[in-house]
Amino acid sequence: SINLYDFGCMRIFKSKFIQGVIDLYFALQKNDEALAVHAYEQWGFDDITKEKLDILSKWANFLYAPLMKDKVQKIQESDSGIYGAQIASEVHKELKKIGGVKPPKEFVFMDRAAVGLGSVFMHLRAEVNWYKVFHELIENFDQKKLTEKQQSTLKLVNL
């Protein structure tokens, strides 16, 4: 197992946000724009126009790409982060053209974690069936149960 710590910080993602991660996965898989808009709204984005949706989905398609195929593969075909940096640059430029976007705080933390973990898996040259792993992780996800568990755990530690 690999444990990553963000300089001693602990991130708590609300169940609604986690549900948005799952919903966006299925939205991208099924090319379901309404579900994608709903997912982004669960993350805290607002005013999702068709143009903004298309731009945000470029980045999402990059991040979710390894989860889309049921096969053993690297997290990214290239062993460098150049492709990801190019996608990020394109998305940034396109968002700037339409007036920008204020990313929700949780999105920034999740994005950092995804990029960081992706980098670790690239350097390890890990070949995994990411689709299978993701489906095993989300198989029994229950937003209500997670909310209850988070609330009781945070209360237990006075947070």
Task: Label each PLM-derived region with a short phrase.
Residues 1-159:
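Helix-rich C-lobe and terminal helical cap/extension of kinase-like folds
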